[in-house]
Every structure is written in C-alpha cells, then in structure tokens.
Amino acid sequence: MLKYVDLKEKPSSFLAATGITDEEFQALLPNFETAYRQLYATNLTFQAQPRRRSFGGGREAKLASFADRLLFILNYQKTNPLQTMHGLSFGLSQGQVNYWIHRLLPVLRQALAAMGMTPERDGAQVATASSASEGGANLSVDGTERRIHRPVNAEQQKAKYSGKKKAHTDKNILLVNENTKKVVYLSATTEGKKHDKKLAEESLIRYPKNATLTKDTGFQGYEPEGVLTAQPKKRRKMKS
C-alpha cells in the first residue's frame, strides 16, 4: 500500500508516482492542509454531520495524514488509473476512491492557486499574465491526450477516437514558458479526434508582445498575429 513515509525514501519512484520531487511536495503540503481546513470544517464528519468524538479519534483512517491525502490525489492526477486499481494502491474500495477524488481535487486546485501555480484557462488573459513573460516571452505549445474508457454512445466513440493514439482520448493544449518550464495556459478539454491546430485556434489565445512560439507539426499553419513561430525539423532516420 502506498504511504508517503515509505515512498519519500525512493526519489525516483516518488517522482514517477507524483510528477514532483519530495522538496516540491513539502512546499505544497502546508498549502494543501490549509485549503482542506478552509473547505471542510473539522467539527463535522465527512457526511457534514456534527462530529461526536474529537477529530482524529477512533480507528485510524487509510488516508489519515494530509501527506497521504496529497500523495493520493497527485498520484491519481499523474497516472489517471481506473478507480478500482487506484484503490488497490491505497487499500480503498472503488467507492472510497471516488469519494476522496471528489473531495480532494478542489483542495488541490485551491492550494495550487494560493501558490500562484495554476495556469490561465482564458486564452485572452495570456497576454497580460506575468507567467507568460517571465524571463522573456519564449513559449511553446503542445497537445496532450489522456486515454479514457470507450464511450457507450456510438457518436461519442467516433468523436473521442484519436487516430494519433489509436485509442479513445480527451485532449488539451498546453502553453509553456520555456524559461521557467511553467505551464502558462491550459485549454478547455475536448475530444481526442480534434486536431491540435483547430483547438489552438478555437482557444483564441492572445500572446504577449514580441513573443516567440515553438510548435510541432500538429500546429502546422497556426500563425498567431505578431508572434514569431518556429517549428523544429525532425531528423530523418538513416536507412541502414
């Protein structure tokens, strides 16, 4: 069963499980605990009923510590597993996993926002976002896809099927500051079938003055006004 106290002793495994280092985890943890206490009163049970015994009393819960709760939600976000499989990693039933996911995601979002680490979701705001110009407005754009369960509806199956991934997916585009490696912008989630270029155009991103933009072939033809774009050429494989 995954526990923070055990996993932190294995740096490479910790990074693979959460996407961050233990040092970054420790910086996030106090904000995560503060956000949790702000969102959920500790004098109430998880069902919002008055608590009869003191908080932390009784049998120890599987996710008793804030460190384990943060590990749980970061690992879920990083790996996107089936809830049943995620439960096996933390000793929880599928129902308990579903409960904790919905309880902890708002906490994580609030904690990251308090640290100024949440990306813009409105493309029009990118031009004035300090994160976009930090160190110079050298940006890169990329599409990211996540596998999803095959939809039951036939039309949804067609819309969600990504020819690139040969699977049913959801898609977003990310705008990253190449100087700081921070995600500046995260688009709305859309079906995996949609092309990267089309999603970028629909996002109506406004760029800072004198911005440069690195893109791949998925964004060929995407030329925002006033932005110097570059598309690195792929090396051709040498025939043996």
Label every model-predicted segment:
Residues 1-61:
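Charged, often Cys/His-bearing segments associated with DNA-binding zinc-finger transcription factors
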Residues 65-79:
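Short, amphipathic alpha-helical "recognition" segments used to contact nucleic acids or chromatin
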